Amino acid sequence: MSYSLAQIGMEAEAEVRVARAEVSEAAFTTEGSRPEEAPKDFFVERNGLRFAGTHLILDLWEAERLDDGPFMEEVLRRCVEAAGATLLHLHIHRFTPNGGLSGVAVLAESHISVHTWPERGYAAFDIFMCGEARPHAAIPILREAFRPRRVTIGEHLRGVF
């Protein structure tokens, strides 16, 4: 298990180096020139507030397919696409013997994480996104995919100032 975690970490570090190189190249018009515009901080401005991002907390009760790893991966990918976010890395881990899942979609705009307890029909999702991403767009996808009988949703605006 530690080998797979180290391997995941190495892959993530390589992806970050590539992303940094792409950002560095895109920020300049020619070598040694000034950036075309000031760096963007990806904070959100909405209703007169400026904040780091929107953090949604979803609890799904009496939900289906909470032990299906490939399905969970597909659903998370659809959530990322619907939100207009940029997927950097996706990992799902399946626990035995109950088949619970823990997963994370690492995004350029932050993350989506999930933990499931199939024996209880319960799933906990965190969706945190900054910039122009639309985290609320993931909610109907999760409802349709897992068909919960009860859903609770909390919203927290992170980094308000």
Segments predicted by a language model, with ranges:
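Polybasic/polar functional segments that serve as interface/processing modules
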Residues: 1-161
